Amino acid sequence: GGGTATCCGMSDTSTGSGPAFLATDGIHNFRDYGGYPTQGGGRVRSGLLFRSGQHVEASEADLQTFADLGIRTVIDLRGNAERERHPCRRPDLWDGDVVFYDGETSSRPPHEPDRPMELTAQSAHERMLKVYTRMPHNEAMQTIFGQYLRALAEREGASLVHCFAGKDRTGIAAALLHHILGVSRADMLAEFLRTNDAPTYDILERQSLPGIEARLGGPLDRAAVAELMEVREAYF
């Protein structure tokens, strides 16, 4: 079995439906996705499974939180271009492993439009539905999801899985693991939707919105932004 990790740095922003989000300065949506009951009376272990957005703006305090959690393996679901544009920070003395796909997992992060278009809440919602519909058929995503599951099965200690925002690709990765472990669909959905309660929405907007608006030529409708930055039950 894997080693244990100390759950420290927790914020006071628990929704009551799962472990609290970790308090961070520059990492969006950082949380433990363990703790859920499984069929047969078991429970997914807490303190071993973490998820988040990218760590490109991680502060020194964030890196200390990362180190204190005992994370030995990072599974980065982003493709090469994303990782080169937004290199993640790690603690100076961290000697863990980063698992990644050597290629592109997405032509652009799922919440960023590929080309100039008039984005309304409806068109943004429809775009995100297509992202989730295509994901199971994306060979790169199939490969990295397999790498993720193998890493959890074979490696000791705590792990962290992340993409750009920690909500779409990461949300499906967490759901795949929960499904395998026998977590109920209701709890899987609740975990997926907890992204919308993350107290770090400003970090995601800061990292995503300027680039999106630059490509589209102006400010976006707030309802459209919400469809891109949040998750919906329909996406699951």
Model-derived features: positions:
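Ser/Thr-glycine-rich phosphate-binding loops at phosphate-binding pockets of nucleotides
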Residues: 165, 169-170
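Compositionally biased, low-complexity flexible segments
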Residues: 1-4
